[in-house]
Amino acid sequence: MALASQLSVTDDSAYGFITTNAEIVSKKRKLAQNDDRFEVVMSVYSPKADSMDVGVSVLKLKTLELTLMSFCDSSTFVRTVNQIQVYEPTSIILPEAQSHSQIEKLKYIIHSNISDKVRERFMKAKVFNAFDGMNSLKLYTDINESTLGQVISNRKLSLAAANACIDYCVSTKMFRVTNKIRLKYCMCENTMLIDTCTVRDLELVDSLSETGTTLYSFLNCCLTKMGMRILRTSILQPSTHENSIILRSESLQELINDEDALISIRSSLKHTCDLEKVFSTFLEPRGLLSQEQEINNIILLKTVLQNTFVIRKSIQNVSSHLLVQVKQILEHENVQHLLAIINEYIRNDCQWANNSTELANQRANAVKSGVNGLLDVSRRIRETLLEEVSELVAKLSEELEIFMEYRFEISRGFFIKIKGNNTDINSLPEVLINRVKKRKTIECTTIELMKQSSRYNDIVSEITTLNSTIIHDMYTSINSYTPILLMVSEAIGTLDLLCSFAYFTSLQKDSYTCPEFAKEVTIMRSLHPILGGNNSNFVANNYSCNHELSRIHVITGANMSGKSVYLRQIAYLVIMAQMGCFVPAEYARMRIFNSLYSRISSDNVDINASSFSKEMSETAVILNDSDGDSLILIDELGRGSSLTDGFSICLAILEDLICKEATVITTTHFRDIAQVLANKSCVVTAHMQTVETNGQLEMKYNLVLGRNDIVGYGIRFAEVSNLLPQELIEDSKVVANILRSRKPVHGDKELKLLSRRRKLVLELYFALNYISKLNCDMNYKMQLLQTLQSKFVEEINITPNTE
C-alpha cells in the first residue's frame, strides 16, 4: 500500500549553426541510456531470539521508494532469499558479528545466495533501532505522524531495518537529507513463496541453457519497461489473494473480448518510455544536472503527460474494476494541473532534444515569451548578435571570394569553416587568424568574430541565469507532484501487463481458459504452455486433486516418457493462474497455493548429473518448510542412491509429506512405491503410458491411472541408444529375468484387498458430498449419481470382500 499522499522543443534559429562542446554532448547522451540498473539498498534484520521473524527494507535510490516488509521465515530463510531475488539489491545491510547463532546463520545464507557484484555491508547492532527508524520516517516522508503510526505500528523489525538502510545511505552520501521518501508497505503473506531452487529448476526468469525459453520470455509481450518489471515480479511472487487474482482475470477477459480496444491500447503504449526513470529525475538534487538536461527532462515529462491523455482515451469505455482504477489514476486532476504548469512556461512546439544542437537551442528558447521581460530582451539581443555574425561572415566571404560557413562552440566561440582540399592554408588573407587544417576543411576566425563571441557568451550567460531561476521554480513545483507521477507509472505498467496477457492469449493456437478457484483442483486437457504451443502433436493431460482422496500423485514410467515435462506443466499452470493469466486447458479449477517447491531433473542424460547429497539437502528444506498449503513437485525421488536405500528414503519422504497434508506430485522408477502407497486414502498412482509394439517401446505421453506393467524399459532404452555393445545388452536381459523370477511377493493379499475396498467407500463418500453441494439442475445431479453408482458397483464387485 502506497503511503504517499496524493497532491493537491525549440524554435530553431534561422541560422542553425550552433553546436556544443564534447562535455555537453556526453551529458546529453546519458539521457538516452536504457540501463535499468541503479542503486537498490536492502537492509535485513532478525532479532536475537529463537523466533524466525525477519524485517526487510528496500530503498530504490533512483525513485526514492522505500519498501518495508516483515514476515515469519523458515529456518533456512527461504522467503528472505526470495526477496533478494525479487528486488535485486546492489547493496545489502546486515548487523555486525553477533554471538547469536540465528543471526550468523542468516548472514551465511544470504552470503551464499548472492552474486559477487552485490556489496555486503555490516553495521553496528544499535543502528537497527525501531524507535530511530520511526523518527527517520517522520523526517524523510511527508506523511503525517498519526497516519504513519497507524500503518506501520507494531512493525518494529521493518522499522529497525529501515533505520539502518537510511543511515547507511545518508552516511555514504547516496541519499541527501533534503530528499523525501515515498513509502510502501509490502504484505508478503499475500504472495506465493517460490524458493531459489524452484526458480532455477523451472527456468522462470533465467534459462539453464543459452538458447532455452523461460516462462518470463515466453509470456513477455509487454511494450513498456514498467510492464516488464511487474511481469517479472508476478512470476517470482504470484498472488495468493483470490480477489486480486479475479480482478486481473476480469480485466483480461474484457480486453480479450474487445479486440479493437486491445489494439488501441497497445498502440498508445508503444512509444511510452520508462516512466519510473523519467519521473525519478525530478527527485535528484539540483546541481547534479546541467541546465540543458533539466530543460530536456521537463520537455520529456510534458511528452509523457500528453501521452497519458492518448492512453486514457483508449480505455475510456472500460468497465472492469482494475481497468477503471487505471483510468481514474490517469484522469487524476493533478496530472492535468502538472501539464498546465509546464505549458505555462514551456513553448508548445518544444520537443525532446536528440542532439547537441537542439540542446543548445532549447537552453535559449524553451521558455515561453512573456514569462520574464528581461529574458525576452536578452533573447532579442542574442538574435540580433546572430544576425550580425551572419552578415559579417557573408560580407567577408564576398570580399575574399571564398565560400565560408560559421559555427559556434562554447570553448571556442564563433569560427569560420572553409571547405576545399586544394586551398593552401598559408595563402589565406591575414584577416583570417588562428588557422587550423582539419581533413577537407580549414577552420579560422577573425578579430571581429572573437569580439562577437565575447558579447554572445555574455548574453547567453545572462539568458542561462534567468532560465535557471524559472527552471528551478518548475522543478520545485513538479517535485511536489511526484507521488501521482509514480502512481501513473504503476498504473500504466499494470495496464501494459494486462494487455500483454490478453495479446499473448489471442496469439495462442490452443485454447486458453480463465481458471476458477476452489479447494479442489480439476484441470482438463491441459498443455505445457511453452512446449504445447510449439508442437501441434503435443498430448494434452488431465490433473485432479482432492485433499482427502488424491493430494499425493505417484507417477511411474519409462525414461523420456514425459514425466518431467508433466511436472513442469503443472507448475507453470499454477503460477500462471495465480498471476491472473489464462491457462492452456479446456477447463481449469485451481486451488491457491501459498508456496511452491520443485526438484526436477532433466530427461537429457548428457546433462542430468545430480548428486545424492545435493538432492537430500534440497529435500530437507522442503520437508522443513512445507505445509498443507504447499505444492511440491519432485522428479525421480531417491535416484541418487542404491536400490534399497533409495527405495527406503523415497518411501519415508512420501510418508512424511502425507502427514504434512501437502499437495505432492512425484515421479519415481521405484515401481513398488506405487504399490505400497496405492491403498493410502490420499494417494493416487499413475504412469505415463507406454505401448510395446514389435518389441519396441512407443511413448504415448499420456498420463494413465494405475501402475505401469511394462518392465525392462531401462535396458530397452540402453539398447535403442546404441551406447552399449549388443552382447552386454543381451546378458543384462538374462540377469534381469533371473532377478525378477526370484523376487518374493511381499504383503498380505487379503489386507491389500481390504484396504482397496475401504478406499473405494471413502471415495464414494467424498463424491456424494461433492455432488450434494453442486449448484446445478436436479436432472443433471441424478445423471451424476447414476454414473457414480454404476462405477462404484463395478469397482467394488471386482474387489473381493475379505471381512
Curated annotation (Swiss-Prot):
It comes from Candida albicans (Yeast). PROSITE patterns: DNA_MISMATCH_REPAIR_2 (PS00486). GO terms for molecular function: ATP binding; ATP-dependent DNA damage sensor activity; D-loop DNA binding; four-way junction DNA binding; mismatched DNA binding; Y-form DNA binding. One of its GO terms (cellular component) is DNA repair complex. Heterooligomer of MSH4 and MSH5. Keywords: ATP-binding, DNA-binding, Meiosis, Nucleotide-binding. This is MutS protein homolog 4. The keyword Lyase does not apply. ATP binds at G557, A558, N559, M560, S561, G562, K563, S564. The gene is MSH4. Involved in meiotic recombination. Facilitate crossovers between homologs during meiosis. SMART domains: MUTSac, MUTSd. One of its GO terms (biological process) is reciprocal meiotic recombination. Belongs to the DNA mismatch repair MutS family.
